[in-house]
Amino acid sequence: MLVSLPLLNKGLFVSMSELLQFLQQRNSAPKLIAPAPSAEELEGIYRAALRAPDHAWLRPWRLITIAGDRRQAFGELLEQCLVQRSPDSDEAARAKARNAPLRAPMLVVPVVTLSEHPKVPAMEQRFSAACAAHAILLAAEASGYAGIWRTGDAAFDRAVMTSLGLGFHEEIIGFLYLGTRDGQPKSIPQLDTADFVSSW
């Protein structure tokens, strides 16, 4: 059976076995360079994210993009929030925070928007947003790009969230760095499924 991913790979048809192999080989790319996905490619990537598992169709997520000069502004924000959290931070730590957004040509910040629901607890809504984030990484890879999911203290800092426009009922799921892989994919040891799967 062949499947087509027209928005992700411009109409290339792949077999289901090739698709499965792609999923089995995906890995994170800590070193990213330009270009980032185009506007058209991002549309396809975001559409993949919108198909995340979503109990009761709450759609408990939204996405914030940071690209171009806004990365530098975001780095300055991260530095300011670091100093607020840790006034004794040295210059190396401050520089690391300031330069973090410059490690890729763009960032996507998945946000979970929590709501009260009798059948969908907050944790399940967070899971849904995390699935959307994972779908972005997979779709970016399918589009010929790469990415890495990072968190760190900034992801849990309410000052960072407020500065990004999050409400009290919203949280950052992570920072997705997207771009073109710089170099060859790193070698990852093959895991044995028997170490992770059991029968009851």
Where are each of the predicted segments found?
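N-terminal amphipathic, basic helical "cap/leader" segment at the start of enzyme domains
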Residues: L5-R103, W200
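C-terminal helix-cap and adjacent tail motif
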Residues: S15-F22, I172-W200
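Small-aliphatic-rich amphipathic alpha-helix that forms the alpha element of a beta-alpha
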Residues: A49, V108, L114-S163
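Short, charged/polar surface micro-motifs in flexible loops or helix N-caps
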Residues: D69-A73, E79-Q80, L114-E116, R158, ...
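A structural motif
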Residues: R103-V109
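Short, electropositive alpha-helical surface patch
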Residues: V160-I173
